[in-house]
C-alpha cells in the first residue's frame, strides 16, 4: 500500500536541524543556513535575526565561528530559529531542549505560548516526561499500524506493555 498526505499548514521539522550547521561558519552564517533550510527567506531572516540571537543569548558570538562559541550554541541557535518561524506544526526530538536551566525554561515558556496559540507538536522521545510536557494526545503504533489514538498516559502504558512482552518468532 502507498499513499500521500497533503498539508496546508506550515511544518517546522526541528529534528536534528542543528546537525546542518557548519563549525567553520559564523553564528550569523549558520542562522541563514538553518533558517533557509527551514523555509525562511533571507529577508525574513534579516528581520528576525536580532530576536533569534537575543533568544539564543549569542549576541557576543554573532560573527564568531561556531567552533569558538559555547558548546550549547548549536542547539540554542537551532531552537531559536525554529521558534521564530510562524508555523502550525513543530516536529521535535528529545534532544532539542538542552543547555543551561535558564535557556530550557525560556524554551518551555515559548512552547507553552505556541501551544496556547494553537500550534501542534509532534514529539519523538524516549522519555515519558517529554510527552507529558508537549502532548495532550497519544498515538501508539505497532509495525507501522495505528493501534491506539488515546491519552498520553494510556499510549505510554501500551508502549511499556509491548516492551515487556516477549517477541514472537
Q: Where would I find each of the regions flagged by the language model?
A:
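Helical segment within the ABC ATPase nucleotide-binding domain
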Residues: 104-117
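Conserved ABC ATPase "signature" region
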Residues: 32, 46-61, 80
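H-loop/switch region of ABC-family ATPase nucleotide-binding domains
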Residues: 125-126
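GG-anchored amphipathic helix commonly corresponding to the ABC/SMC/Rad50 NBD signature/C-loop
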Residues: 72-91
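ABC ATPase nucleotide-binding domain signature region
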Residues: 1-36
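Conserved ABC ATPase "signature" C-loop
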Residues: 143-144
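Conserved catalytic segment of ABC-fold P-loop ATPases
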Residues: 133-140
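ABC ATPase "signature
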Residues: 149-150
Amino acid at each position: 500500500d502507498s499513499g500521500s498526505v497533503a498539508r496546508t499548514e506550515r511544518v517546522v521539522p526541528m529534528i536534528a536541524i542543528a546537525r546542518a550547521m557548519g563549525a567553520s561558519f559564523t553564528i550569523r552564517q549558520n542562522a541563514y543556513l538553518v533558517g533557509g533550510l527551514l523555509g525562511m527567506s533571507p529577508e525574513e531572516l534579516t528581520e528576525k535575526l536580532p530576536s533569534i540571537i537575543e533568544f539564543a543569548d549569542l549576541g557576543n558570538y554573532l560573527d564568531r565561528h561556531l567552533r569558538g562559541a559555547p558548546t550549547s550554541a548549536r542547539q540554542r541557535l537551532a531552537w531559536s530559529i525554529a521558534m521564530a518561524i510562524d508555523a502550525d506544526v513543530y516536529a521535535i526530538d528529545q534532544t532539542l531542549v538542552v543547555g543551561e536551566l535558564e535557556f530550557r525554561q525560556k524554551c518551555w515558556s515559548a512552547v507553552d505560548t505556541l501551544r496556547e496559540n494553537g500550534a501542534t507538536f509532534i514529539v519523538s522521545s524516549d522519555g515519558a516526561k517529554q510527552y507529558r510536557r508537549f502532548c495532550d494526545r497519544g498515538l501508539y503504533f505497532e509495525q507501522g499500524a495505528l493501534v491506539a489514538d488515546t491519552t498520553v498516559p494510556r499510549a505510554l502504558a501500551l508502549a511499556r506493555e509491548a516492551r515487556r512482552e516477549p517477541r514472537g518468532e
